[in-house]
Regions:
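Metallo-beta-lactamase
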Residues: 10, 32-34, 40, 69-202
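Histidine-centered catalytic micro-motifs
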Residues: 57-64, 114-117, 176
Length: 202
């Protein structure tokens, strides 16, 4: 486990070598939230638990949902994904995001359909803000919008990107994070705005 960030009442850890990238958000009030799950390993689960008690495992999309049942059982955590994404995830989802699911008042979900039907981001709203974009955006250097042949709807991705430009945050993480190469902040929101403005003009 590599600690990437420590700010007011929160820390972000990275699970080295995970693809898609897996992160652990530790919030002083909400507890531990695992973002994506790698192939299950009991030793890794024990390491994660030593960092923080995990209350939730959040899947931004189907791409990061690996060995869902095993992680859920080992961590005694509740699994979370959008209602639209649940049918594509192999394993039990306890909380289907449909506008009513809340982990804590300082955290919210941003639906960013497009890469998959139910792609969703997790935002920690307390300043400085932190957003886990999953596959909605991708690290080039800073996160950007990149089209894929198998996008559920690139048009939806563009609409989501426009909405992202109005958000306030300092740190951003995506599924294709590469430790030591990907930039995540501070200054992520402004860098993403610049990238998106350029891409949407192209």
């Amino acid at each position: 486990m590599i600690q990437l960030l420590e700010v007011v009442e929160r820390a972000v850890w990275y699970l080295p070598g995970s693809v898609p990238a897996c992160f652990l958000l530790v919030d002083g009030r909400a507890g531990g939230i695992l973002v994506n799950s790698p192939p299950f390993d009991a030793r890794l689960a024990a390491i994660v638990e030593r960092v923080a008690k995990v209350r939730f495992v959040f899947f931004p999309s189907r791409f990061g949902a690996t060995d869902v049942a095993q992680w859920r059982a080992a961590l005694a955590a509740r699994t979370v994904a959008t209602a639209e994404e649940c049918p594509a995830i192999s394993g039990p989802i306890d909380e289907a995001i449909d506008g009513g699911v809340r982990i804590h008042g300082r955290l919210d979900f941003l639906t960013l359909s497009g890469r998959t039907r139910g792609t969703c981001a997790l935002r920690s709203k307390t300043d400085p803000g932190i957003v886990f974009f999953g596959p909605a955006l991708e690290h080039g250097d800073w996160p950007l919008l990149r089209a894929h042949d198998d996008d559920y709807s690139y048009e939806n991705r563009v609409l989501g990107a426009v909405a992202v430009q109005d958000l306030r945050f300092e740190f951003a993480f995506c599924d294709n994070y590469v430790h030591g190469r990907s930039r995540f902040g501070p200054g992520a929101a402004e860098a993403i705005r610049v990238n998106l403005a350029s891409e949407l003009r192209a």
